[in-house]
Amino acid sequence: MRFVYPQGKAKALTFSYDDAQNFDRELVPIFNKYGMKATFHLNSGTLDGGIFIQKAEVAELYKGHEIAAHGVQHKNPTMLNKHQLVLEFGEDRKELEKLTGYMVQGLSYAFGAYS
């Protein structure tokens, strides 16, 4: 058995970006120009604030790329109890699904922290 990526490719390169900061407005068009895809890990609770992308632009800006949950407020998961974890990631997923119109399947822990 041999594992292959789309179009029969044997190797893959991934691009992964966190937090939906304003510079994504410049980054995403570069990916689009060269036909490249990326995963963007968004915090639904920080959207619309200061240095972050606006909720109203999420669906169009990230169209064709993967959106993944990253926690509503980017809290360190090692500092949360089970109930708080479910809320932090479950509510983020629900809100991102409303914004994108499709099922969000990916998840990236804030700070890369886990226990």
Residue ranges of model-derived segments:
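N-terminal pre-catalytic segment of deacetylase/amide-hydrolase enzymes
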Residues: M1-F15, N22, F52-I53
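Short acidic, Gly/Ser-rich segments with clustered Asp/Glu that frequently serve as metal-coordination loops
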Residues: A20-E26
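Generic enzyme active-site microenvironment
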Residues: T14-Y17, A68
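Short, well-ordered alpha-helical segments enriched in acidic and aromatic residues
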Residues: L27-F31
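Short acidic donor-binding/metal-coordinating loop in glycosyltransferase active sites
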Residues: Y17-D19, Y109
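Metal-dependent polysaccharide deacetylase catalytic core of the NodB/CE4 family, i.e.
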Residues: N32-S115
